[in-house]
Swiss-Prot record:
The gene is sno. It comes from the Eukaryota. Residues 329-342 have a biased composition (Gly residues). It comes from Drosophila melanogaster. Interacts with vg for function in the wing disk. Interacts with Su(H) for function in the eye disk. This is Protein strawberry notch. It is found in: Nucleus.
Amino acid sequence: MTSKKRKTLLDADDDNDNFDEDDSGSDFDDDEDPDQIEVPGGGRDLNTAVTYAQNIRSGVGVAPKGGIPIPISGAKIVVGNNKIKPISLLRINNNNNNIVTSVNNRNNNNIISTNGSSNNNNNSINNNSQIIKTTTVTTTPTTVGATPTVGGVALGGKLTVIPIAGRNVALDNNLSNMPKKLNNMVTAMGSPAARSSGNAGTTGSSQGGAIGSTSSYLNSLTTNELMNLAAYVAAKGSNAPPPPPPSTAANSVRHSPTGGIPNPGGNFFGGSAAASTSASAANFNMAASLLAQMSYAGGASQIRALKVAGNIGGVGNNQKPPPIATTPGSGGPAGGAPGSGVKGNNSMMEAVQKLIAMNPEYLTSGIPNTVFQMFMQSMQRPQATPSPNQPMNPGAMVTSAAAAAAHASAVAYVQQEEDEVDYEEMGVAETYADYWPAKLKLGKKHPDAVVETASLSSVEPCDVYYKLSLPLETINSGHLSALQLESITYASQAHDHLLPDGSRAGFLIGDGAGVGKGRTIAGIIYENYLKGRKKALWISVSNDLKYDAERDLSDIGATRIEVHALNKFKYAKISSDVNNNCKRGVIFSTYSALIGESNNKTGKYRSRFRQLLQWCGEDFEGLIIFDECHKAKNLCPVGSGKPTKTGQTVLELQQKLPKARVVYASATGASEPKNMAYMVRLGLWGQGTAFGNFNDFITAVERRGVGAMEIVAMDMKLRGMYIARQLSFKGVSFKIEEVPLSKEFRKIYDQSVELWVEAMQKFTEAAELIDAESRMKKTMWGQFWSSHQRFFKYLCIAAKVNHAVLVARESIKYGKCVVIGLQSTGEARTLDQLERDDGELTDFVSTAKGVFQSFVERHFPAPDRNRINRILGLYDETPSLSSVADSTSSLSNNSNITTAAGKRKGSNNNDNRSTKIKKKKRSGSWECSDSEDENTDMKRNRKRDGGNSNSDSDEANSDDDLKSDIDDEDEDHDVDSDQRSVASDASSDFNPFFSGSDSDIDPWVNARSKKSKKAQKKSKKKVKKEKTKKEITTSSATDPSGSTAMSATVVAALNAVKNRKSQLSTQDKIQDLLQKKQELKGTVTPVGVNGVKLNYGPPPKDAIERACTMKEELLRKIERLGARLPPNTLDQLIDELGGPDNVAEMTGRRGRVVQTDDGSIQYESRTESDVPLETLNITEKQRFMDGEKDVAIISEAASSGISLQSDRRVFNQRRRVHITLELPWSADRAIQQFGRTHRSNQVNAPEYIFLISDLAGERRFASTVAKRLESLGALTHGDRRATETRDLSQFNIDNKYGRQALETVMRTIMGYESPLVPPPTDYSGEFFKDIAGALVGVGIIVNSESHPGVLSLDKDYNNISKFLNRILGCPVDLQNRLFKYFTDTMTAIIQQAKRGGRFDLGILDLGAAGENVTRVRLIRFVRKHATGVAPTEMHTVRVERGMIWQEAIDKYADLFNENEGFYLSHQLRNQKRTAIMVVILESRNSSSTSSTTDLDSGSKKKKTHSKKEIMCQIYRPNTGLQVRHESLFELEKKYRKVASEEAEPHWTEQYDASVNTCSHAYWNGNCRNVSLGNDCEVGLRQRLYHVLAGSVLSVWGRVEHILNTRSNSKMQVIRMKTTEGEKIVGTLIPKSCFEPLVADLRSDSEKQEEFNY
């Protein structure tokens, strides 16, 4: 008899790899590469599987290699010289003493006959055997001794079909082991059961030959060939004819030279009575699996119709069930009555229909073994002892099966029970830890709790030797806290070192918003001043911060240090008389002012940069502070962009002053490695470092995954050049409120989408009609997508305004005050509308409409009719006033503006100041997307222009004031088109279409190469410009419209608007181009204009007319839509919340639209008679802080550095409610925004409210931010943290998995790849086709340049930010479905990475779940680096993670919830059950529904408060507390609650065994890894880890080389805390790499130490 321990015929070792605890739910064996094995429902290419499935259904066999399809009814298995071989593997579970005998039939074909007496214990499935996401068959044993019947294979356990799609690969190592496995069956072959089945002639010796030949034959088959063998068995079923008598041959496999043909319809599989049922079961489960495959590939409409038609069997609803399945009920002595098979099949299919309807995921994943086991048992019960004449009751079977389906579904989860334990056992580190200076015991405690990232907190900073010179009074008074003094000390100490290239080392302050970077910087300046270095440069983002700088210096006692504004200086030597002999102190500059230039090109100091260099001197050793230094990012941009001028200037300043003491200060400075290019003083790359240049550094870091920057940051902290703390968010609460979109809003949104799509078509057509040059088209499309993005963002924000007003009023009613953050003000759109309406407004202006309208007016590729006709000489007409107004922007019609402008001015520089203000008011010809960096560049260029035209301090001041106030446009950048045009010409480095911009087209790509040509024409342009200016002035002065008494201010503003370069907008450029073409009409050769080849003449008049008509038509449609678009968000909020008297507005706009007492709407200036414009925001802030106003509205960039917290020093100490209407999709940026109301020295913490709509993944972004806030200690709506402790990265989409998912989605939509995940089943249309159409409308799918007429993907199709911005332009339903499909794809990609062991979790925490971590050994290598020496350490640690029974009982004693306690698994494996202990956390607060103030939704939440929302912690005997939490609902599918007495033996057994027995061996009886001679630590209580810690950066390349050559694992960063309290963070080193790496590190270290513990 066969041993009960043996599992299967073909795999007796370890089939239960689906229970591997380290494979994250993998469906693959340990040594199988998931990329090499294609699996139904899980593989990428299902074509082969689908074809195979369809052929089986239609009665056609699958053609083997080079063969032709064969009808199944006459299918044959022929060996020998025949080429046709079966294509599937039959894995037969021998758990119930079945015997496989191979004999030879008269036709010399193989016979695989399974005979055996099956017992009645209905052991229908062997729990120790497993499949690979395959078809599983459980047999239905019948009465012992039943007479043999037709066809089939008698099995006591399960038949497993392994469909491997279309690839000639070996199936794992199993094929090579087949001879051994088959030979193991020799003894069984001689059993009486075998002989009684008609194989008595087979002797013992012949059995050996039989097995040898059979194994040889099977081993020679490819996996595809093996696959069809099982298909054939299933196809024959129990209705096949009886087997032929066996031949008397010594071998069961005889090779026929002629390849004999079997009898038509003959059965080649003999079997017992049980075989009928067995084959039926095989047929059934194969049918279910194949249906799943076909559904997955979209090739089976019958699956889709499953729930409706109630017929799962046919290809069409009217077809009969397939012939491949028969019923278990047909197995009588004679094979059942005729026709019973069809009835049974119908019943079986009906039952499986219900099962799949209840569990639709089976369509893609297949039906799990355990579900099938339960299902089959329920199908068998009605016919346990069937009477031969008893009619079948299909209805009873169906009902029984359906009733069992729920329980079967529950059991399905058992397989996954242990899957992810070891994968996530280390978990994700708590992101932050409380902070206190480690090595400096100086000063008083910081007034608020401060935290540090987990990785940095594990690294001790270098020793302190620097002695501060600050007065004791400053230190002891607490004006500088202990952690600020620590920063000052380390910065000063770092400045003592020189880098290998001779320049002085710098220091990076990475403190978050609100910690007090400003005062820290003031302390560093004071320290250097006391050391005799009296000069310092402080470069920041806003002029308003100059006042904060003066305040900070004053607060710490440095009253003697003066702060000078760079923009106040004239363009002359700073230390000269004209600049008041400024020879010491701090020069405060913005990044914009830093790159300013004078219009006077002959002066020696015509640029601010030269002024500063002269003032500092060549040997300058003083301070240069780059505050908010992330504004200098994009020095090394990606894609087609160019380095920003800001970044280049910051770099050049450091190069020119190599001995200067540089301090970088930015909360986000080191978060993005590519934004560190200007941080050349940190010694991370360059001479004497591991990286020769920045590109080497960036390549190395980005290749190493999520934890790479943490390693860099830790290394910098170790070297004493970096410090980063954040304010704890303890006490802060936040809630997410979902604002439902009304049907009306959705309708307006979708209509807007349609109009933008139409606009794109018109722009494309018109550009072709007027023969626009390529550079012009690039500019135009850059503007198009910029406006497109802002339009829809305005629309999204406007949808939430009413809800925000309600929340704000409610908060004020309860004694709180409100802060509302906006990204932009939309002022330029308001001014445009004022100009159109002659200053007479009837309602609030729609910003969204204004964006669209202004864009079309300025950039539609169609010229002004009159002007172009005059240019082309078609007819001559005196230009109408309107045409002049089009180009001159008729400002004179607005008396309100005149009054407002006049009111603002009170000094003799009125005209100049109003000039600049009016420049600001023009809307942007160069408007770009919402990004801070572009805001910086815009400001820079405005400054550049200002510098060109101003030489006195007041004028320069005006311009810089303009810059700071234009921050109101924040990331909207509604700035003057003229100004930015001038800027773009003045500096070819300005690139408004880059730096986070959604715009992908860069009109400045070749600007540098064209510079010389522009210079040659400069003198001609100047003459033309002067002439134009005179004409404009005259036109304005003699305006016949009635404006005869314009103020000098408005006239000056009007002239200033027109004082610009000749090419201003697309329309102007077109007219310029057409004029040139007209001049060239009739020329023989094309002439280059601005580097572009021109055609011989202008386009025909009708083409121009058509373009003009399209523009007018588009503007009419915009006007109609605009009547329904929402008004300006800022104006509406102010109006609804009590008007300007109750709302403090801190933006940069100069005017606003208000509703007067009589209900009329008018535009008024924000300026007040007693408040200068430059201090207006500061005054407004003070009114809010003094409690005069209850609401503050801030525009994000304008409020940079502003403090609105409930400060102990101010009167208004009420709690702040910070309402966010637009969440950035970066959690880092969101935290920066929250720094306005959450800062040091506050009385109470703020409350954040995120308003989200169901558009474009807003809910997911809110989840990202919520997770980050939670990790910082914030509370979800006042409750303690209750969400799953999962990796934050699962919410983050801007990472390599997100980019990979986006690429996959786009390629799937285009049909380049098969879908990784199926499209939504509830979508009525053609999903991919409809999505593709929508993406064409938003420019992600474009007309191919190389193959016109062919659609292709845009070059930046895999840019995440661009994708998120663009899909806003899709209809609401489609954009949500597309985003959902994208996130589903990303999840699938992450799961693939997990299965392959390639998933990068970031930093993992060893010991976070309470394990004991003990250090066993330490080897320390002391190595040199750029600024000194630092240790590199190799730690060996032992982790004990088990939980003894007594500890579990102690924990159990503290539990009180009825659902808490011990649980046992439903499933029995290897005669063992899993014991766990469950501790209830509490109900999960779903981020999408929690914390609404709506009473209705509150009641809904109570109703849905079910077991699915109750989250549980799980403790296991061998691995302790699990990182992954599960819901009670999921747990009860897999486990049942038991008393502690019942759980104890199971608990202690696993605990004791796990000290040296891995989970595979424990649950399966053996482990493949161990049998192959390898170590297996899966599920072990104790583990050894090797961790490389300390200064790793300098040896990182060598580490990676060894890891790559000896192990295919990635570099995993882990953190641990030993039982002795030692913190260790470093890179996990695989055992195979330990010895070679230690040897390598020994080879060149300066000093070595080794310690054993």
